[in-house]
Each structure stands twice: as C-alpha cells, then as structure tokens.
Amino acid sequence: MLQPVWSCILALLGVFIFHVGEVRSQCWESNKCTDLSSEDGILECIKACKMDLSAESPVFPGNGHMQPLSENIRKYVMSHFRWNKFGRRNSTSNDNNNGGYKREDIANYPILNLLTGSDNQNTQQGIMEDEAVDRQDSKRSYSMEHFRWGKPVGKKRRPIKVFPTDAEEESSEIFPLELRRELSLEFDYPDTNSEEDLDDGELLDGPVKKDRKYKMHHFRWEGPPKDKRYGGFMTPERSQTPLMTLFKNAIIKNAHKKGQ
C-alpha cells in the first residue's frame, strides 16, 4: 500500500525539481528538505518549494497561470508605465523632491488602511480623476498663453480720448461725457432737393464755407449721379420722364385695352 503512495510522491517531487530551475537550489538548501525519509518531510519540502515559486513559473500540474500576480511583480511591472506616477510636470524647484509619488504609496497611509477594500478603491479613483483634471488644466493654461485672450502680451489697450467741438461744448451741460461720442458720429446728410438743383461740378469745385456744413461728396451714399439714377436706363437722350410716370402710363394703356 505504501509503495504506490511513495512512488506518486516521489514522482511529484521530481516534476517540481525538473520544472523549477533556480528555485531548486533554494528548496534543497532549506531546512524542510533535509528529512526526506518520511511522508511528512516530503510534503513539507513540497510546500516549501511551492512557496518559493513565482507566478512567472506556475505550479505544474495545477492552475498557477490563472492565479494573480504577486505584489512585488505587480509593482515592478506598473513602475514602467507613466500613469503609475502622479504629480505635475511643470512643478517648481521646491517641489522636485515631493513632486511625484506612486500609486502604492497612497495605499500605505495608516488612515487609508483602516478603510475597507472598496472604500480604498473609491478614494484611489477619486484621486486619479482629480490629478487628471489638474493635469489637463495645467496643459490648457500653458497652451492658452500663446493666444491673446489667455495672457495678453505687449501694449495694453489705450482709452480713446474724445475732444468735444464748439457745438458740443454748448450742450456739454445737458449731455454727459459718455453721450458725446455718439453725438460726434451723427452726420447731417444733405437733402435730395438741394442736390438735384445743383450740378456735380458746382458741388465739387465750389469753396467750402466755414458756416456751411461739410457734405461728403466723395462717398457713394451722398447721392448718385444723374446718369446713374433710376437704375441707369433713364438717360437724357432717351427720356426725362421719371420711372413712376412710365409705370402709370403702362397701367393706363392696359386698362384702356381691356375696356375696349
């Protein structure tokens, strides 16, 4: 009865020793593997070898590849990634020593150790979100410095000085200073009747009087020339009749034809 059991145990021990390269010397050097004459000693030696095995070399024939990584290996792997570290990139020289810290350091605080596992995960997620928002704000402020509305560079905007005229000085007591700018923008446009009576040559060649208001003859909205009025098709060679008179005559002719 004992020979099959001993053969199975020795076979398992041989499999462990064969698949474990570096751990084999550690198993034989331990005190638990010195006594292999009894079944209990062999089982203790197997347990010692199993404890020394890492997750990178799973236990055979078990399901060691399904087991999670150990804490030391997880720290080693996560330390290579950028998101494992916190801290602003544009930190000052005073914060160089305390600028970056790892995720595992947060979980080692004594206050956080009192909380449960779910609360600890929630706090870590909240800290990660806050740090991500701060990092985005710092990057946004850095990029916005290049634009005018982020950080104005150069001369500041100077206030516009308004000097009142002689006519505005008389009404300075009535209108406040803020309304004087609006008064300066009000132009007195010439009447159409006076322009029709005068020729273009007289308006341009005539001297400008001081008591007379300035007329903007060089602008388009001052008044169209005579050859451009009524759309340009009413030239003096054709007819001097206004456009409304032509429409009235056409309407009367159509009504007269319908009456016949």
From Swiss-Prot:
Modified residues (Phenylalanine amide): F86
Glycosylation sites: N90
GO BP, sorted A to Z: neuropeptide signaling pathway; regulation of corticosterone secretion
Pfam family, one: Op_neuropeptide
Signal peptide region: 1-25
Key words, A-Z: Amidation, Cleavage on pair of basic residues, Endorphin, Glycoprotein, Hormone, Pyrrolidone carboxylic acid, Secreted, Signal
SMART domains recorded: ACTH_domain (SM01363), NPP (SM01364), Op_neuropeptide (SM01365)
Modified residues annotated as Pyrrolidone carboxylic acid in this record: Q26
Places the protein is found: Secreted
InterPro entries, per database record: Mcrtin_ACTH_cent, Melanocortin_N, Opioid_neuropept, PMOC, POMC-derived_peptides
Reported modifications of this chain: Specific enzymatic cleavages at paired basic residues yield the different active peptides.
Cysteine pairings via disulfide bonds: none
Residue list for modification Valine amide: V153
GO cellular component: extracellular space; secretory granule
Molecular function GO terms recorded: G protein-coupled receptor binding; hormone activity
Propeptide: 104-138
PANTHER family assigned to the protein according to its UniProt record, in alphabetical order: PRO-OPIOMELANOCORTIN (PTHR11416:SF7)
Family, as annotated: Belongs to the POMC family.
Designated name of the protein: Pro-opiomelanocortin
Lineage: Eukaryota, Metazoa, Chordata, Craniata, Vertebrata
